[in-house]
């Protein structure tokens, strides 16, 4: 077993070797290196063929028409293009947008920008299980609502929202529905023929593909219109200009092809690994699972260890790659805004660790990780005066601390 052990698959995944192999074929002079937009010679035609094949592979995972897939540089760009693109195009219809307090920053910072431009945004608070229900969405809708954006799977706590039911609601009201699906491809079945989602963001690097590439699903029937955010040569039917990076797109296509083929058995294997890990740590006192345990992807276990500082626990677990909060915001020392939205107090939010498992995680690694977590939590609590007070029956929330 090689140390350190990677248990941070929701931050990024390693590129699957089969994906890397396909990508390498599109780089050098011997390979398929042409510009897909070069229409006048065979190098361009061959590159375009590879790109369109990849587009088909992405579409097949989510049962969409390949013409509905727009290439982007990642889910952050897809979120920006979807939300700003719709807001600017449909601004004459209304200026109200609905989203949730637990979205990824790529959605929240985009809606904040639109607020500065004069749009109004309602931020839904989820239940304490981390789920945003259709009833919550319905309560937030107004006459002038033009867009609802609700994530499929949460990046910090792994909870799954019922986008099928929310889609029925938005379609009945004639409101566009955007879903950030960066964390759900290859983990949850998605059928865009059946569900009434108008826009959906995808990322390659959360699904064993390369970083720096993603896609946006833009529904054709009923047709969704967007205002482009990136201008240039008019690539991607004018929605997203810029030379297509054949190797990146081929990588994403292959990653999504593998995801479609292997998702069912991979989910079962990962669920068994997660359960095995949890069984070995659940005896720890004052252990809290963040988010619903049922409406959740098996890859994610977000735990709060009360009376242990999350940062010090991460330092103590130096052989384990885990995170507190999401990778995009874990550099700040603020407690997780997602856990705060669930109603967790600052102490519990600060003591949370996200363990995320994936394709290359082994049973041996799980057992080692669980043992290390138990040792570290026990040791850190032995050093904690708060833990002593708690064990002595003191209600710490009622203690009045003296300032010196």
Curated annotation (Swiss-Prot):
[2Fe-2S] cluster binds at residue 328. InterPro entries: Aminotrans_V_dom, Aminotrans_V_PyrdxlP_BS, Cys_deSase_IscS, Cysteine_dSase, PyrdxlP-dep_Trfase, PyrdxlP-dep_Trfase_major, PyrdxlP-dep_Trfase_small. GO terms for cellular component: L-cysteine desulfurase complex. Its EC number is 2.8.1.7. Pfam families: Aminotran_5. Keywords: 2Fe-2S, Cytoplasm, Iron, Iron-sulfur, Metal-binding, Pyridoxal phosphate, Transferase. Its main location: cytoplasm. One of its GO terms (molecular function) is metal ion binding. It is found in: Cytoplasm. Its cofactor is pyridoxal 5'-phosphate. It catalyses: (sulfur carrier)-H + L-cysteine = (sulfur carrier)-SH + L-alanine. The active site is at residue 328. GO terms for biological process: [2Fe-2S] cluster assembly. The modification N6-(pyridoxal phosphate)lysine is found at residue 206. Pathway: Cofactor biosynthesis; iron-sulfur cluster biosynthesis. Gene3D superfamilies: Aspartate Aminotransferase, domain 1, Type I PLP-dependent aspartate aminotransferase-like (Major domain). Pyridoxal 5'-phosphate binds at residues 75-76, 155, 183, 203-205, 243. Master enzyme that delivers sulfur to a number of partners involved in Fe-S cluster assembly, tRNA modification or cofactor biosynthesis. Catalyzes the removal of elemental sulfur atoms from cysteine to produce alanine. Functions as a sulfur delivery protein for Fe-S cluster synthesis onto IscU, an Fe-S scaffold assembly protein, as well as other S acceptor proteins. Belongs to the class-V pyridoxal-phosphate-dependent aminotransferase family. NifS/IscS subfamily. Homodimer. Forms a heterotetramer with IscU, interacts with other sulfur acceptors. HAMAP family: Cys_desulf_IscS. This is Cysteine desulfurase IscS.
